[in-house]
């Protein structure tokens, strides 16, 4: 008869192995396409490929490169390329291609072109009965791959290995390898990243570029009205009570650039993830500085193209320096005690006019304490002696100017009591 403790141990071992198996995901090769900084300080774009076999991985990486080149040639992404990293996860499918069940009402010439492929993310056309709506059905597999390989993703492109036109927004900006693939990708990114609506009629909801408010004074893109052809344009029927800001935007047609409203929303989406300041020094925001010491402050902002970043330094809310990433502070120029050093960084891009949340502004504040570190050495010659007494006496009787670190009893006054304390220090009392 088998010992019950052995059975219990085996059951525990089996459960442990099963748990480890469930928690251990599959790791795939990840190619760095474009790296501009640490993943925790950039918008991280991750590409997933569906319908690429292992033998087609080189084609997949080439396809990713073409899309990335096109994306960062488009305004405003071209202006903010320094704010992004791009990675491509190499996930092979068993078969090349995707699914087209031929079930959509608008398949047209592709109605009889029915095919299926065994792909990793099970992408398919004809979703919701719309031929061009190309989606990955196995989204849980996509999330697993992202978590196991690039857990700090912000944007996901899912590129499907077929030349038939199609794509979709949502959590994953999905598109095919059609001749218009880059345009499709950038358009779908408008949905999945910037939360933009289509500017052709699909359905209505309030977004940065879609509204039911036709009053110019109340309209959300009021700061742009009548510039760059921005207006309040009615959607076609049945969306006659909804309005878009432009008649020829990338969110309506492939080919044109983003309108001013959509470009602005894209930039604000970047800054909803990132801080303008990449890093700063000192990293410790609570500082103690000797009264005759020098403290160095610096920041590393993420610059856009062309650069529209401004930098302003303040000490105790008083302007000190503009335009520099560095500040050298001589503590002797300030009183003993608490001081605030602040740097304010702003992006004054003319592509943004409406920023009520101040997303295009960032600051760092250091709390600095200036204190004496050599009690009694008033002339800072490294010794406490009669010369310091003479200096203090002259100050008390009004012959010389104020002396730093002379308030030896910290009562807020420099007087005979401080002279007595200084003499006692010299005498060793």
Region roles according to the model:
Residues 182-199:
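Active-site recognition of the HExxH zinc-binding catalytic motif
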Residues 23-27, 275-280, 340, 363-377, ...:
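Low-complexity, Pro/Thr/Ser/Gly/Ala-rich linker/spacer regions in secreted
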């Amino acid at each position: 008869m088998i010992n019950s403790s052995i059975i219990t141990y085996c059951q525990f071992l089996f459960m442990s192995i099963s748990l480890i198996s469930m928690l251990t995901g599959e790791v795939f090769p990840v190619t760095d396409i474009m790296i501009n900084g640490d993943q925790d300080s950039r918008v991280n774009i991750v590409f997933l490929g569906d319908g690429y076999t292992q033998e087609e991985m080189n084609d997949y990486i080439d396809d990713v490169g073409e899309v990335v080149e096109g994306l960062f040639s488009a305004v405003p992404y071209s202006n903010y390329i320094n704010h992004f990293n791009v990675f491509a996860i190499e996930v092979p499918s068993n078969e090349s291609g995707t699914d087209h069940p031929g079930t959509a009402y608008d398949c047209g010439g592709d109605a009889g072109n029915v095919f299926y492929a065994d792909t990793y993310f099970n992408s398919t056309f004809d979703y919701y009965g719309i031929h061009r709506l190309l989606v990955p059905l196995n989204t849980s597999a996509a999330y697993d791959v992202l978590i196991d390989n690039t857990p700090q993703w912000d944007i996901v492109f899912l590129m499907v290995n077929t030349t038939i036109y199609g794509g979709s927004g949502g959590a994953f900006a999905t598109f095919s390898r059609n001749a218009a693939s880059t345009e499709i990708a950038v358009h779908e990114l408008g949905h999945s990243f910037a939360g933009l609506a289509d500017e052709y009629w699909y359905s209505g909801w309030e977004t940065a570029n879609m509204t039911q408010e036709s009053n110019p004074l109340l309209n959300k893109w009021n700061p742009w009205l009548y510039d760059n052809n921005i207006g309040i344009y009615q959607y076609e029927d049945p969306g006659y009570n909804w309005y878009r800001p432009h008649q020829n935007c990338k969110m309506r047609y492939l080919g044109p650039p983003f309108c001013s409203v959509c470009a602005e929303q894209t930039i604000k989406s970047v800054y909803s993830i990132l801080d303008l300041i990449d890093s700063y020094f000192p990293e410790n925001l609570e500082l103690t500085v000797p009264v005759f010491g020098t403290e160095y402050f610096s920041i590393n902002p993420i610059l856009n193209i062309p650069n529209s970043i401004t930098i302003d330094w303040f000490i105790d809310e008083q302007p000190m320096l503009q335009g520099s990433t560095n500040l050298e502070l001589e503590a002797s120029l300030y009183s003993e005690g608490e001081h605030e050093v602040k740097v304010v960084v702003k992006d004054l891009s003319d592509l943004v006019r409406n920023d009520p949340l101040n997303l295009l502004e960032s600051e760092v504040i250091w709390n600095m304490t200036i204190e004496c570190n050599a009690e009694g050495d008033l002339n800072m010659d490294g010794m406490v002696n009669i010369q310091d007494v003479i200096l203090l006496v002259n100050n008390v009787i009004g012959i010389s100017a104020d002396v730093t670190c002379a308030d030896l009893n910290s009562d807020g006054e420099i007087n005979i009591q401080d002279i007595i304390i200084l003499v006692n220090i010299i005498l060793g009392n």
